């Protein structure tokens, strides 16, 4: 895939990632990847004031959320199916930047992320590699959070993986101006695009998951399926529709 590549400094590890995901320099591309010392960052060349995007599992935001974790306040704990000493294996079929997958892994679940877009996969892989080396979270992150680079539909149609839970967070069209995310995330969504195969993804997921399928939706969005939603958990901005397997 073609993208503008900018090096602040040479990094052998990141150069190997660029080769692995076949990311090649294009002088005319409006999207850029910045090799910023020890991290890989996506940025908008048309708006240099826009904050670059990177996967950082050691961020202050993640640290705060983990440090202040309370079962009743953490919606991902409530929808995950965790109970006593049971920690389900979760397949995140729409990994994105890995934010929710990280929280599931922090809660004690083994999580497999699937991402098909090579640029996003490179960002995730970079974040994982740095996270694995972190002294505070690396010891458990290495055993719980992993990435498969492939198309989710293709992976789910091959019954190799047998997760307890499948988690879906498909991109959804903006409803109105008030629902717009921050500008940096709007830029990221332009890269990913809308998940037109999300209904098919849910259907296939219900044939594979052992215990439940969780679909994260904006609060205003219709359910992804016309079938009955077995359980719903709501927050201020989102709704988590839980389906039973077929």
From Swiss-Prot:
S-adenosyl-L-methionine binds at residues 115-116, 169. Its main location: cytoplasm. Keywords: Cytoplasm, Methyltransferase, rRNA processing, S-adenosyl-L-methionine, Transferase. Its EC number is 2.1.1.242. It is found in: Cytoplasm. GO terms for cellular component: cytoplasm. Coiled coil: none annotated. The keyword Nucleus does not apply. The keyword ATP-binding does not apply. It catalyses: guanosine(1516) in 16S rRNA + S-adenosyl-L-methionine = N(2)-methylguanosine(1516) in 16S rRNA + S-adenosyl-L-homocysteine + H(+). It comes from the Bacteria. GO terms for molecular function: rRNA (guanine-N2-)-methyltransferase activity. Pfam families: SAM_MT. PANTHER family: RIBOSOMAL RNA SMALL SUBUNIT METHYLTRANSFERASE J. Specifically methylates the guanosine in position 1516 of 16S rRNA. Belongs to the methyltransferase superfamily. RsmJ family. This is Ribosomal RNA small subunit methyltransferase J.
């Amino acid at each position: 895939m073609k993208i503008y590549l900018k090096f602040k400094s040479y990094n052998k590890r990141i150069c190997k990632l660029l080769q692995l995901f076949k990311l090649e320099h294009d002088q005319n591309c409006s999207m850029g990847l910045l090799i910023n010392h020890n991290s890989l960052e996506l940025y908008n060349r048309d708006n240099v004031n826009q904050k670059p995007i990177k996967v950082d599992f050691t961020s202050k935001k993640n640290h705060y959320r983990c440090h202040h974790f309370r079962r009743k306040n953490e919606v991902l704990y409530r929808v995950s199916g965790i109970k006593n000493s049971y920690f389900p294996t979760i397949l995140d079929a729409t990994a994105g930047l890995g934010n929710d997958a990280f929280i599931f892994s922090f809660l004690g679940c083994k999580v497999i992320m699937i991402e098909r877009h090579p640029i996003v996969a490179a960002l995730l892989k970079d974040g994982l590699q740095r996270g694995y080396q972190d002294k505070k979270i690396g010891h458990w992150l290495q055993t719980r959070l992993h990435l498969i680079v492939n198309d989710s539909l293709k992976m789910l149609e091959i019954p190799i993986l047998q997760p307890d839970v499948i988690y879906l967070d498909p991109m959804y069209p903006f409803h109105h101006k008030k629902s717009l995310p921050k500008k940096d995330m709007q830029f990221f969504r332009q890269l990913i695009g809308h998940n037109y195969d999300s209904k098919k993804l849910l259907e296939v997921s219900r044939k594979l998951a052992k215990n439940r399928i969780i679909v994260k939706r904006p609060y205003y969005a219709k359910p992804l399926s016309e079938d009955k939603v077995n359980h719903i958990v709501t927050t201020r901005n989102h709704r988590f529709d839980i389906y039973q397997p077929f």
